[in-house]
Amino acid sequence: MRKIILASGSPRRKELLELASVPFEIIVSEVEETIGAYSSPSDIVMSLALQKASAVAEYNSDHIVLGADTIVTYESRILGKPSNEAEAKEMLQLLSGKTHEVYTGVAIIAKDKTVTFYERTEVTFWELTEEEIDAYIALKEPLDKAGSYGIQGKGSIFVQHIQGDYYSVVGLPISRLVRELKQFNIDVTHA
C-alpha cells in the first residue's frame, strides 16, 4: 500500500489525521507561503496546498501526499498568521463581535491523480474586551495561527457561533478528506 505523507509540520493537522486513524508520515514542505494575485480565498488556499504537496511529491512520487493551507478573511481582507503581537491584537480587534470566514484548502497528490478542494466555515466572535485580547496574546497561542486565534485552544472562548466544519477551522476538514481519500483506494472508515 502506498504511504500517505502529510506535507505539513502543523501539530493540529497531525492530531486530526491521528483522530481519524489515517496512517501517515510527515515530511514538512519548505514552500514559502506567499499570497500572489488570486481571484478568491478558495483559490489561494487550494493553490498554497497544492504547492506544499507538490514540493514533497516531487521526491516521493510513489506515495500519496497531502498538503493543506488555512486563511481567515474578513470583508475581503486576508488574515494570515500575525508577524508579531501588535498585528495579532489588531486582527482580534477586527474580528471582535463580527462574523468572518475561514478557508482551508487541501491537495492530495498521487502519481496518477491530483485532487484539490476547500471548505469555507463562518465563525462569529463575541465582543472582546481589550483585557481579554491582551491576556490571550500573552499566552502566545495566537502567534502561529491564521487570524490570530486557535478555535481548539483558549481562543474557543471568543467563539459565539460557527457554521460549517469545525475541523476545517482547526486546519484540516478531516471528514471531507477521508471521503476524498477513497478516490485513492484509501478507506479508513473501517479501521
Swiss-Prot record:
InterPro entries: ITPase-like_fam (IPR029001), Maf-like (IPR003697). CDD domains: Maf (cd00555). One of its GO terms (molecular function) is dTTP diphosphatase activity. GO terms for biological process: nucleotide metabolic process. Its cofactor is a divalent metal cation. Nucleoside triphosphate pyrophosphatase that hydrolyzes dTTP and UTP. May have a dual role in cell division arrest and in preventing the incorporation of modified nucleotides into cellular nucleic acids. HAMAP family: Maf. Belongs to the Maf family. YhdE subfamily. This is dTTP/UTP pyrophosphatase.
